[in-house]
Amino acid sequence: MPPYTIVYFPSPGRCEAMRMLLADQGQSWKEEVVTIDTWMQGLLKPTCLYGQLPKFEDGDLTLYQSNAILRHLGRSLGLYGKNQREAAQVDMVNDGVEDLRGKYGTMIYRNYENGKNDYVKALPGHLKPFETLLSQNQGGKAFIVGDQISFADYNLLDLLLIHQVLAPGCLDNFPLLSAYVARLSARPKIKAFLSSPEHVNRPINGNGKQ
C-alpha cells in the first residue's frame, strides 16, 4: 500500500508539482479522484479542514494546503536545501512561484477572455526574477537554489510548463529558464511522468482553459 494518498480533482492544478516530486524521488502514491459533481454535492467539503482540496495523507498524517504538503515532502525527503540559508532561499523562491500562480489562477478562472492578452504582456516582468535567481546560482546550470533539487524546483517547473502552454515562446528571452525547463524535464523519472497518460490526459485547469 503506497504511504501517500492525494485526494484531488481530475486536473493537475495544485497537485502536479507534488506528483512530479514524488515521481522523481521514486515514491509511489495513490490517487483518490473527486469529480466536480461529487464535490458539488457538498458532502465532502465540510470534512476538509479549510473546505478545499487537495487533501494529502502520509500514513496517519493528513495535510491540507498544497504548499504545506510540498514543504512536508521537502523536509521528509531531503528536498529543502542543505542548510538554513538554502532553506530560506527555497522558501523565498516557492513564495515567488505562488505569487505568480495566484495571478495565473485569477486570470484563468475569472478573466480569461478579457485578461489573457494583458497577462501575457506582463509575464516577462514576472519571469525575470527567476532568471535572475538562476544566474546567481552556478551560472544557471544547476537548480534554482544550491546544487541539489528542492521542492521549489518542482513547483517552479510546473508553473513554467503551464505558462509555455498559455504563451508558447514565453521563455524565448530567458535562456537560463528555458534551459532549466529542458534540463529538469529530461530527468528520467520526470520525463516518464510528463509523458504518462495520467499527466497528458488531464486538462491543465478545471474549467478547460489554458
UniProtKB/Swiss-Prot annotation:
Reactions that this protein is recorded to catalyse: RX + glutathione = an S-substituted glutathione + a halide anion + H(+)
GST N-terminal domain sequence ranges: 2-81
One of the GO biological process terms: glutathione metabolic process
Keyword hit for Ion transport: no
InterPro entries according to UniProt: Glutathione-S-Trfase_C-like (IPR010987), Glutathione-S-Trfase_C_sf (IPR036282), Glutathione_S-Trfase (IPR040079), Glutathione_S-Trfase_N (IPR004045), GST_C (IPR004046), GST_pi (IPR003082), GST_superfamily (IPR050213), Thioredoxin-like_sf (IPR036249)
Entry EC no(s): 2.5.1.18
Disulfide linkage: none
PROSITE patterns recorded: GST_CTER, GST_NTER
Top EC class of this enzyme: transferase
Residues that bind glutathione: Y8, R14, W39, K45, Q52, L53, Q65, S66
Residue ranges crossing the lipid bilayer per the database entry: none
Tissue expression pattern: Selectively expressed in gall bladder, colon, heart, and skeletal muscle.
Transmembrane as UniProt keyword: no
SUPFAM superfamilies (alphabetical): GST C-terminal domain-like, Thioredoxin-like
Keywords carried by this UniProt record: Transferase
Taxonomic superkingdom: Eukaryota
Domain GST C-terminal as annotated: residue spans: 83-204
GO MF annotation, one: glutathione transferase activity
Assembly with partners or alone: Homodimer.
Summary of the function given for this chain in its UniProt record: Conjugation of reduced glutathione to a wide number of exogenous and endogenous hydrophobic electrophiles. Cannot metabolize 1-chloro-2,4-dinitrobenzene.
Family note: Belongs to the GST superfamily. Pi family.
Record's protein name: Glutathione S-transferase P 2
Taxonomic lineage from the root: Eukaryota, Metazoa, Chordata, Craniata, Vertebrata
